[in-house]
A protein has these predicted regions:
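Short terminal or interdomain "cap/linker" segment that borders an active site or interface and mediates
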Residues: 2-9, 13-29, 131-164, 177-202
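Amphipathic interaction/junction segments at domain boundaries or subunit interfaces
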Residues: 59-165, 182, 187
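Soluble, non-transmembrane catalytic domains of enzymes that act on hydrophobic metabolites at membranes
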Residues: 167-170
């Protein structure tokens, strides 16, 4: 496959060793709000450790947190054992919610004639920098309207909930630049620190 966006650190299609270290609180807040909207808030809180429960109930957006707190959030959400369609929808909601942040600048590109998901995928490093520190992303062209998105150094990839919700996140963002988009994790290419998703659109 042709490389569309090389890994930033290596400048090639060879992934680096660069673990994610921090997550923006905006992602966790948005994820909690999406669960609350669906009536899972109390169950979610009950699954958190006491320390995380105290921190998450008073969390504000825009703060940088250790990625371990992101893991705590996704593991608690995973323990809810929600249907995959619900988890995908939660990921889509998170993408929609954070569009009110500087990411909206990229979204405005969708109003320009000729802009496609490929243009948005070219911004993957910059978009990722808004909410994560560390790790790296590489994107390949699997077809005229199909991409393979790989994120390395991401410990949250060890949580099934994250794999599905992040696919929903990518689906929603790609859909802003297309009539309809789909995204799913490629499980055989995922590891405890790597998430690989296939994105397609029409």
């Amino acid at each position: 496959m042709e490389i569309h966006l090389p890994f930033r650190i290596t400048g090639t299609d060879k992934p680096p060793s660069a673990p994610v270290t921090q997550i923006r609180s905006t992602l966790i807040v948005s994820g909690i709000q999406a669960l609350r909207t669906r009536g899972f808030y109390d169950q979610y809180l009950a699954l958190l450790t006491p320390a995380a429960r105290t921190q998450f109930t008073s969390l504000i957006t825009g703060e940088w947190l250790p990625v371990e707190l992101g893991l705590e959030h996704y593991r608690a959400a995973d323990a809810l054992r929600l249907d995959a369609r619900v988890i995908d929808a939660v990921g889509g909601d998170v993408a929609t919610r954070i569009n009110s942040t500087p990411l909206s600048v990229a979204i405005k590109l969708s109003k320009r004639v000729g802009v496609t998901p490929w243009n948005a995928l070219s911004l993957a490093h910059r978009i990722n920098d808004l909410n994560w520190r560390g790790g790296d992303i590489g994107i390949w062209k699997a077809g005229a309207k199909e991409a393979l998105y790989q994120w390395v150094g991401q410990p949250c990839a060890s949580v099934p909930y994250f794999l599905t919700s992040f696919s929903g996140y990518l689906r929603e963002l790609s859909g802003l630049f297309a009539t309809k988009a789909h995204a799913r994790p490629v499980l055989e290419q995922c590891t405890p620190t790597t998430i690989t998703c296939r994105i397609s659109w029409i």
